């Protein structure tokens, strides 16, 4: 038991110490650290470089893999987008050619990239990965063997020491010792193999360096191939640009003429020919400006090559064409008379004799470049023709020189310097340029020889759209005296498509409408009013007049015989009784309304408004006698309150009511037995008087007229409520006769 316990103790010690590495000498530790650095470097390079394809690099089976990888490349996707854009454009456009060329270049670049990646995988990544898989893996295996043998050797060594300490038999101690010696020899061999393998890897450092060098060479080859394709594509693009017509505005005259293979600038020829054909008689030609929007529109249309002959209607205004000519000359990088000869022209202008000026100008014109001389000759000939029509266009040679000289000669301006502008020099130079240009226009035959052919590339009489107005000038129709109605010219816009509204038919002096036969001699009348058979429309019958009251009818003004005859009495309808209110019962309806005690200086908010008591209508009283009450001075009776007809109303009705009343009274007297004509109050009359008032007399009536009626004072601060209208009673009969 004691021996077994000792063995278990030794095994436990060995087990606890198995993870601990044996102490190494300094040489192996340094070699191992260097190998670890190599391993880390190679692993990073292999991880970052393109991964190996499944096909194994080059070979017959790698073409499909290469195509798949090419289509996944970003350059190939860009090429597809460029090709799609190029297909949507016409083939004669420079942009379409450039897009197609760039698409081919991007595809080639994608193929070059994939080829470079495959070469990198084959020449660099494969070799580095072989070092990792073989060399580094072998070193790791040897290292594990050394660690295992070292652990075994340590265990045997401790067992030998324990056997000696426990005084084991000699045979057993010798056996353990022999095992220890054999393990030690094995450990030394494995250490040597491990060290040799690591040193071999270190010796292969040149191979690792050569792999990196091959990667760089591969990159150079890729960029060289790509550069060749880029240069070839760039050359084709440059040829396309050279074959394309340059932008006309802001381009040097020589470059524009070279790219278009012309002798005269296209803008100069187009403007001059258009103005020669339609515009020489335009007043203020080349002097009158135009709208900036129309100028910009035509300029950019010419730059975009959107405007071609025949010119559309929007680009036929002679003032716009003249402004385009001046703008083109002004935007040239170098003036038409050049910077080099600027001082010579200024010096010539200082000569006092015109003959000396002409001689020196003719000598200096020979120094102009060929392109400038040809265009100057062409332009000045056109200006001289315009000057010949100065009686119509009001543009003499002096006026033309003032307008055109700033666009043909100006000094060089140094934009880099911060020196102040020489305004005096600019004024002097402009006056000198006016003198030079005026001589070139007025004395054109002296400076130039031969005649100018204006229509070099354009066709005469085909510069404008046929069937439409070829001139939009402002004085086109000033001299017409015909009677035909003309529409106002519309400049730069299409004519109205919608037909105009027809004018009303004309009338003669008597207000009679003229028929189509009377206006048949007028062409515009025929157009507006075509001859048609007029249909007679029947006039509707007049409606019958409304039933008016008898006192408002026209016949009421003159009493007829039928009005004087007795008429049957109208049916008597009793008046509807009006209930008496509480206010009327107590006699409070005639009390004055309380008003606000305020001064003129008080504000509206300094007192409280006291509204008036609502006024109730008076209960109508029946007359004391059956007759019409005597009218008062104000034309109102006591019982009617201004609602029943008064005597004035009867008189205004021209006696119509009076005749009816007399007839009714006569019949009433006959029924009551009143034959003597005296006014006696009957019992019937007294019974009908519910107020039991005595009969009204003339004195009472005068007293009532003199007695003032109590009224409610109305103040501006009181609120009045409208009175309820009273129900008028029918006019009762009277027992008195009229005086007539």
Curated annotation (Swiss-Prot):
Domain (BAR) spans 13-246
Name the GO terms of the biological process aspect.
imaginal disc-derived leg morphogenesis; negative regulation of actin filament polymerization; negative regulation of small GTPase mediated signal transduction; neuromuscular synaptic transmission; positive regulation of synaptic assembly at neuromuscular junction; protein localization; regulation of actin cytoskeleton organization; regulation of Rac protein signal transduction
An example GO CC term for this entry is: plasma membrane
Report biased composition (Pro residues) as residue ranges. Answer: 566-577, 725-734
The UniProt gene name for this protein comes to RhoGAP92B
> One Pfam family from the UniProt entry?
RhoGAP
Sites where Phosphoserine occurs are at: 469, 473, 593, 715, 738-739
- The region called Disordered is annotated at 49-74, 467-740
Q: What does this protein do?
A: GTPase activator for the Rho-type GTPases by converting them to an inactive GDP-bound state.
* Feature: compositional bias, Low complexity: 694-713
Q: Which SMART domains match?
A: RhoGAP (SM00324)
Q: Which residues carry this modification: Phosphothreonine?
A: 595, 721
Which protein are we looking at?
Rho GTPase-activating protein 92B
């Amino acid at each position: 038991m004691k021996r077994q316990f000792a063995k278990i103790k030794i095994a436990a010690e060995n087990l606890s110490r198995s993870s601990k590495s044996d102490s190494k000498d300094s040489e192996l530790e340094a070699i191992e650290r260097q190998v670890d650095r190599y391993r880390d470097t190679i692993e990073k390079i292999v991880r970052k470089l393109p991964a190996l394809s499944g096909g194994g690099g080059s070979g017959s089976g790698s073409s499909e893999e290469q195509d798949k990888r090419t289509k996944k490349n970003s350059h190939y996707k860009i090429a597809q987008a460029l090709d799609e854009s190029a297909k949507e454009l016409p083939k004669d456009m420079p942009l379409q050619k450039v897009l197609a060329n760039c698409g081919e270049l991007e595809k080639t670049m994608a193929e070059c990239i994939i080829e470079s990646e495959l070469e990198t995988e084959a020449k660099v990544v494969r070799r580095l990965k072989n070092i990792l898989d073989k060399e580094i893996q072998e070193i790791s295996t040897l290292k594990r063997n050394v660690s295992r043998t070292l652990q075994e050797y340590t265990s045997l060594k401790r067992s030998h020491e324990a056997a000696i300490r426990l005084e084991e038999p000699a045979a057993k101690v010798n056996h353990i010792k022999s095992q220890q010696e054999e393990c030690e020899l094995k450990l030394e061999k494995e250490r040597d193999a491990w060290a040799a393998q690591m040193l071999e890897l270190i010796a292969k450092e040149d191979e690792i360096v050569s792999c990196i060098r091959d990667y760089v060479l591969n990159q150079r080859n890729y960029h060289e191939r790509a550069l060749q394709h880029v240069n070839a594509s760039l050359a084709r693009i440059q040829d396309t640009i050279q074959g394309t017509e340059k932008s006309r505005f802001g381009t040097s005259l020589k470059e524009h003429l070279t790219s278009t293979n012309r002798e005269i600038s296209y803008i100069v020829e187009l403007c001059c020919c258009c103005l020669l054909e339609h515009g020489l008689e335009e007043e203020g030609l080349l002097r009158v400006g135009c709208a900036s929007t129309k100028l910009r529109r035509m300029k950019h249309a010419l730059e975009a090559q959107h405007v071609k002959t025949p010119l559309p209607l929007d680009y036929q205004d002679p003032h716009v064409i003249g402004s385009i000519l001046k703008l083109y000359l002004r935007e040239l990088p170098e003036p038409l008379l050049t910077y080099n000869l600027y001082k010579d022209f200024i010096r010539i202008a200082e000569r006092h004799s015109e003959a000396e000026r002409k001689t020196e100008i003719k000598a200096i014109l020979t120094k102009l470049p060929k392109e400038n001389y040809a265009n100057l000759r062409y332009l000045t000939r056109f200006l001289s023709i315009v000057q010949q029509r100065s009686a119509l266009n009001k543009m003499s040679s002096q006026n033309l020189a003032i307008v055109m000289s700033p666009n043909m000669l100006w000094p060089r301006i140094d934009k880099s310097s911060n020196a102040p502008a020489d305004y005096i020099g600019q004024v002097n130079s402009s006056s000198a340029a006016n003198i030079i240009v005026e001589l070139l226009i007025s004395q054109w035959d002296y400076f130039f020889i031969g005649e100018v052919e204006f229509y070099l590339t354009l066709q005469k009489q085909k510069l404008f759209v046929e069937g439409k107005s070829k001139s939009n000038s402002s004085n086109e129709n000033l001299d017409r005296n015909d009677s035909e109605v003309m529409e106002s010219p519309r400049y730069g816009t299409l004519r109205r498509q919608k037909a105009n509204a027809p004018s009303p038919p004309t009338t003669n002096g008597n207000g009679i409408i003229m028929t189509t036969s009377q206006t048949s001699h007028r062409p515009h009348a025929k157009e507006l009013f075509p001859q048609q058979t007029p249909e007679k429309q029947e006039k509707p019958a007049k409606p019958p007049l409304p039933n008016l009251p008898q006192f408002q009818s026209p016949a009421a003004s003159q009493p007829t015989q039928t009005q004087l005859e007795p008429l049957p009495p109208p049916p008597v309808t009793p008046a509807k009784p009006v209930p008496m209110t509480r206010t009327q019962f107590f006699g409070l309806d005639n009390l004055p309304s309380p008003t606000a005690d305020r001064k003129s200086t008080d504000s509206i908010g300094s007192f409280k408004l006291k509204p008036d008591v609502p006024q109730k209508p008076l209960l109508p009283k029946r007359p004391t006698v059956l007759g019409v009450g005597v009218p008062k001075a104000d034309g109102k009776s006591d019982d009617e309150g201004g609602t029943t007809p008064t005597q004035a109303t009867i008189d205004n009705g021209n006696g119509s009511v009076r005749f009816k009343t007399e007839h009714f009274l006569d019949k009433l007297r006959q029924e009551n037995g009143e034959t003597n004509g005296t006014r006696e109050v009957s019992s019937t009359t007294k019974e009908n008087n519910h107020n039991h008032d005595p009969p009204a007399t003339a004195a009472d009536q005068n007293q009532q007229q003199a007695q003032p009626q109590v009224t409610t004072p109305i103040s501006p601060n009181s609120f009045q409520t409208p009175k309820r209208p009273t129900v008028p009673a029918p006019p009762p009969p009277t027992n008195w006769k009229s005086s007539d």
